[in-house]
Every structure is written in structure tokens, then in C-alpha cells.
Amino acid sequence: ASPIPEVNISIPQFTVVPLTKGWLQVKGDFAIGRSFDRHTIEQFANEKETYVYDILWHHKSLALQVKDTRHGFPLSARIGVNHWAQWGGTSTNPKIGVQPHSFKDLLRVIGGRSGGDNATFADQDNVLGAHYGTYDFKLTYTHDKGSLTAYHQHYFNDLSGMVFENGTDGLWGGELTINGLSWLKKVVVEYVNTRDQSGPFHFIWFDHEKHPGVGGGGDDYYNNGEYRTGFTYANQAIGSPLLISPAHNDNGDITFRHNRIRDWHFAAEGALSTHLSYRLLFTKMNS
């Protein structure tokens, strides 16, 4: 997808945390933005579709890295979290209309809290807006002859995913970098699974203080019942390209129709001579 117009405050590179003797580094960002893709959606959506336009966005991330910046210890570890949220805007569904968009509502979105009395029933029952996120884990071993990295990105759309009820869903990968071998410099293997989704259907727990119902299951990644365009900008997916963007639907459907996948990705690169290098990419999709 194209970048969402936003104001972003960030620590873009890992920066050493004081008093940690160089062992702990941090980076992150905080952003507020707005969609300007109404015309694109209007031109694409079929006449039965309803959607929210002029959507407001919030994004934040935080990553911590434990690494010997003096390069005396070969192992490094990284953990992080990414959070995106859609809120505000106006729905073409007259029963929904203008969505809450005050500063107080922004604070609710930032904190992942439920909506106020002017929010829809669903947003009062769950959280205000549509939320998407990942947990990131990475472990790297570095040697004079190269490096070996294992990493995992865990997906979540709601609380059930945040507490890992969606099992092993996410991206699992490994990367091998080889020094001193020109014809094969790097190999990457990745596996993406989104088939669990906290179960095959949405379930309800009858223990909410204000309304009878809160639950999970049937996470339906990148889709949302009210923000029908889902995790997209200008009809293109913001997250994994393996979850096919609504722009490729042939019937004006603005949702992700194929979001239960189990795919493999392989890549390799190197140089065959001083003037000839190569990169091979192969993806096996099973959705």
C-alpha cells in the first residue's frame, strides 16, 4: 500500500539506553494519520458495499534489543510490538454515520479501550475502532564467517490473538548470511500461517460489566465489521502481501476474502562474478 499521510515522532534506529553499559537498545515510533482514499474506494466498491471514509489512523511501535555493542558477545535478542488502529471517519451506512473522533476518543484508541456512549454497540462492547498488531521476536548469532537469525512475527486482531489463543499464527523465518562465499551470500526461509485465528467461529463470554458479551475466535485477519475496507489504504493491504489485497477482487468486494493461508517463501542471493549478481525468490501459496 501507499504510505498513509501522518505525523510521526520516532526513534528510527536502535539507540543505547543509558546506564546499561551499551547492552540495551530501544527504538519506536508514535503516529497519527488520516486516509485520503475515498475516491479509490468509491470507484471500486459494488453498490451493496458500505464503508467508512476519511478514516483516522493511529500507529505506535516499541522494540527492545539486547546486544553487546562492543561485539564481544555473539548472541543478540530483540522483542517488539506494533499496533495500528482505525477510528473516526464517516460510514456510508446511515445506521452508523459519523464515528467518534474527539481527543478523548483518541486516548481510548491509543489505550485500546472501549468506546463511549456515542460509539456503536460493538465498539462499546469491545474496543473503539479497528485494531491490528504484531509481536516481534528475533534471535541472532553472529560469527566472523557470517550470521544466523531466527525470527517470529505473531499476528493479532483482538484480545484473543494478544493472549496467543490463535496458536502459531504469524510469520516464522530464518536467515543465514555467509561471509567470504561470493556465489551464495544469503539464504532466507519463511513460513506464514494464518489458519488458526483463535478458532473457526466467534464465541462470546457473558461477563462484560455493561453489555452481555465479549469474546474472540474467528479473528478474520485484516477485516473488520464496521471499517469494512480493513487493514488497507487505497484498497491495498498494509500488512503481509500474502493476504491478497481487496483490489484483486473481481466483484467490488472491499474485504479480504482469502485470509486463512499456509505459505512458504524462499530466497537466496549471491554474485557469480564481479559484474554479475543474482537474487532468487520463490513463494508457494496455499490459501
Regions found by a protein language model. Name each.
Residues 14-28, 65-78, 141-147, 178-184, ...:
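Short loop/turn motifs that connect adjacent beta-strands in outer-membrane beta-barrel proteins
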Residues 1-41, 45-52:
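Long alpha-helical, hydrophobic tracts
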Residues 122-287:
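Outer-membrane beta-barrel pore domains
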Residues 52, 56-60, 64-139:
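A conserved mid-domain beta-alpha-beta active-site/ligand-binding segment of alpha/beta enzyme cores
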